[in-house]
Amino acid sequence: YPKADKILEIGAGNLNHLKFEKNFKKYDVIEPKNYLLEIASLKNKKKVNNKYADIKLIPKNSKYDKIIAIAVIEHIENLELLFSEINLHLKKEGKLVIEIPAEGEFLWWLGWRMTTGIGFWLKYKLDYGVIMKYEHVNNAKIILNKIEKFFKIEKIKSFPLNIQHARLYIHIVCSKKHY
């Protein structure tokens, strides 16, 4: 992850990503589900400067060196609004780091189908795919296309292979477009 003084984490959950960030001066989070922040460790809670329930609640003059969204973007309905707000808060030379499941690609589908899909069916006799349509409202292709409209993609890394349809997870580093 690129190092940064001022960081904003979108969808911080229980603050489990904090251990990967070093030497920052300010760490703000967006988390609409307050109970997730409540179960975070006291050590991590002390490192957080500001907590917001929504990106629109961040003061317009707040700028960040790095904005991160780990396993969050696939859940957001209005990506255009989110990316517009991120652009507002990302410093000119700042970095946006996004990690998403490679949903919609073959290996992701196969892995999901053979693990969660079967497990859910065996336990509940229900198709988890129906639930996933409401949980993950965007697949990887949609997300990558929207990112390209708002940001310059500097790097894409994938796990386990850096090949489309042979990946489970995608790590994207972006910067602002300079016109």
Task: For every predicted segment, state its role.
Residues 4, 64-65:
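Local beta-strand N-terminus motif with an aromatic residue
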Residues 4-13:
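Conserved class I S-adenosyl-L-methionine
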Residues 68:
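A conserved beta-strand element that flanks and buttresses the S-adenosyl-L-methionine
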Residues 77-91, 95-179:
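S-adenosyl-L-methionine-dependent methyltransferase catalytic module, highlighting the catalytic core
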